[in-house]
Amino acid sequence: MNRLVGLFAMLSLMEFPGFGQEPAHQFYFGVLTYPEHRYRLILDIEDSALYVIGLRPNRIPLDKFRRDKNQISFSRADFFSGYEGIFNPASNGIAGYWTDDDKKKIMLEFRVVDPDTISGFKPRVVPRSGYGVPAVEEGIPTRPFSEVGIDPGRIETLLDRLDEGDFEYVHSLLVSRRGALVVEDYFYDFNGSAAFGIQSVTKSLVSALTGMAIARGEVGGGNDPILKWLDKKYKRDISNIAAPITLHHLMSMTTGLEWDEVTYDYGDERNSLSLADARDPFRLLFQKRKLPGNPFAYNSINHSLMNMVLRNATGLTNEMEITSRLLEPLGIKNFDLGNRDNRGLIGDISLRPRDMLKFGMMYLNRGEFAGKQIVPAEWVEISTSTKVPVKENLGYGYFWWTTTYEWKGKEVGCYFAWGHGGQYIFVVPDLELVVVMNGTNWSTDPERYSRQIMQDYLVPACE
């Protein structure tokens, strides 16, 4: 069992009955140490939760909790991890051992702590001192609100709400208007200097690479069948199944391949994404399909198939292609391409928020950045236009999502890259607006947060 899954599934506590002597709302700090990583934990008895401090916070209720006098133990029936400890009334602390899924015991002690001293527990430990124009770095111009037509009142209200934790686990907010960065703020112990996992925002980067490959004549347009670009072992076995599928079907999520990435949470074996860990997920997936062109079905394997097409069509590894054709021309140096699978395919990568902004600003400028045409302008328009409706006011292009917002009594179009947990690049061409957000909303609804932030604050802030 994956250690992180087992750990995060355990990290929540029911209230300790009988502790009675503790002052109201005390917090306990502990560190769970593995050879390769240290997990900082905060126990909040009043809220009955154990928080993981850092970039992946979570809390999940326990199935079992026992207390016999000062002996404390908790576990979860469907996991093989648990904790046993002893509460010491004199020190007001808890000492014990965490037993993980391979039966290894690890000492874990909790001591009383002021959470305000623990960075990462709250959105901001040191209060904001007021608005400041972001620093000029790496070719991204910066301007004050007054020079780009932004209402400072709405921005200040939004930042206050982020400071108060009204939008949980939003770690970054960057706003660019009329080609200049005007807002750059970070929360929950993140400062923007490190690369952040962008999850399925990676798909929109692959869309850009596809447009470049089409312009170079390496692949055809949307009607090009994928069969001729698949690895040889698939051409023989699944040619009759894959033959009708085109690049259009791949990038618009209409392949007809049976896949359910929505009904069950990620990590649940019933979620089709679990197939991605199989020895040969493509072969398993192609065994069941409907005719391509069927209604939209979000499918991360489509992204992997597109990577395969590009690798075979360009003659470049996916790593070489994305680095030489996209990241380097954008001046992006601090990145992580993540783990490649045994087929050499890139899943999701990590970028700094500012570098995500560069990508969004390039698309706003029809594929041009710093005087260089990186992505064909025609492809920017093609890939970000709606190809298939998803639900009310939500559509999908070629690895880009589409929506509209209300602005001054009319609707303005928006396309956006969207990754699990709250990773976003929003582009609103009519307002010359680009917004980047990163988050760790693994168990909440980041779509609701992001839409509220955009519709209630950032879009109407544009004068």
Q: For each predicted feature, which ranges?
A:
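Bacterial Sec-dependent N-terminal signal peptides
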Residues: 1-24
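N-terminal leader/targeting segments and the immediately adjacent pre-domain N-terminus
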Residues: 16-71, 78-190, 216-220, 252, ...
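Active-site SXXK
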Residues: 179, 197-222, 250, 306-310, ...
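Catalytic-site signature segments of enzymes, centered on catalytic residues
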Residues: 192-195, 262-347
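Active-site helix/loop module of the DD-peptidase/beta-lactamase fold
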Residues: 216-257, 287, 314-351
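Active-site-proximal alpha-helical segments within enzyme catalytic domains
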Residues: 302-309, 347-368, 423-440
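Active-site Gly/Thr loop motif
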Residues: 333-334, 381-434
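Structured C-terminal helix/loop/strand segments within mature extracytoplasmic catalytic/sensor domains
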Residues: 417-463
